[in-house]
């Protein structure tokens, strides 16, 4: 309750809009019971509670829909009046990540995990699905700089934007780059160092520069069905033989 009171007071002083209804309340009976049940009193937990407290006080435009675990030197930025950064429940953000919503909306689904040193830049719309894993040094952006006019500095020619969607249950490997206009289906694996742009079907494994589909996870799983069945049969027979000899 102290957190909500301080946050509300800060919003009144700054003249900001009312509190977003999606903002979770952390000091509740349920949250205290969770802390007790999980023995969440270690220095690791206490430091993350402290970081979350100051995030809510100093950055009210960052919406946290539930408990969020924040590592060291993390940058969570949403430009007031222009952008919104929404973090789902149980999101883990490792050390030195940078999630920047300059304009538009940057949404992170429940239980997404960020390794370290990842950068997400949003100027229109970026969505990272629930339970998606981002490794280290991943870069995601939904814009490009315009460079058509050779007589005008590139920095003065503006940008072009297209939304980025990374579906749930994806694994984005080390040093992957996801460019504007990309839609990554659920359950995809983006191999290390891949540069991805465009549509990627669900359950695909993508690698290379530019990124291309290397295999279909469903096809691989079904192709190994006979092997799995044979191994299960061996395990059953072994267990049956052991039970018979023991009797």
Regions found by a protein language model. Give the residues of each.
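Domain-scale signature associated with acetyltransferase and cell-envelope carbohydrate enzymes
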Residues: 1-141, 167-169, 202, 211-215, ...
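Short coil-to-beta microelement around the adenine-binding A-loop and adjacent beta1/P-loop entry
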Residues: 61, 163-164, 182
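Beta-rich strand-turn-strand
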Residues: 121-125, 174-189, 194-198
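Proline-centered turn/helix-capping motifs that create local helix->coil transitions or kinks
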Residues: 140-149
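A short acidic, glycine-rich active-site loop
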Residues: 153-164
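A conserved catalytic-core signature of glycosyltransferases
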Residues: 161, 167, 173
């Amino acid at each position: 309750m102290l957190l909500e009171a301080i946050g509300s007071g800060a919003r009144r002083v700054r003249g900001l809009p009312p509190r977003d209804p999606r903002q979770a309340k952390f000091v509740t009976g349920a949250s205290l019971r969770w802390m007790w049940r999980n023995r969440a009193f270690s220095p690791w937990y206490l430091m993350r509670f402290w970081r979350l407290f100051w995030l809510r006080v100093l950055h009210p435009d960052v919406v946290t829909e539930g408990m969020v675990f924040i590592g060291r030197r993390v940058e969570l930025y949403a430009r007031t009046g222009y952008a919104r950064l929404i973090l789902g429940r149980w999101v883990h953000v490792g050390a030195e990540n940078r999630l920047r919503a300059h304009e538009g909306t940057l949404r992170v689904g429940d239980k997404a995990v960020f390794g370290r040193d990842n950068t997400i830049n949003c100027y229109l719309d970026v969505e990272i699905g629930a339970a998606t894993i981002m490794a280290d040094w991943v870069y995601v952006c939904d814009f490009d700089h315009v460079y058509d006019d050779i007589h005008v500095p590139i920095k003065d020619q503006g940008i072009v934007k297209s939304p980025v969607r990374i579906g749930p249950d994806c694994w984005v490997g080390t040093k992957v780059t996801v460019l504007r206009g990309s839609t990554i289906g659920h359950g995809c694996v983006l191999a290390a160092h891949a540069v991805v742009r465009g549509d990627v079907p669900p359950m695909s494994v993508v690698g290379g520069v530019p990124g291309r589909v290397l295999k279909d996870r469903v096809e691989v799983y079904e192709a190994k069905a006979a092997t799995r069945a044979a191994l299960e049969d061996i395990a059953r027979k072994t267990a049956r033989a052991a039970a018979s000899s023991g009797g």
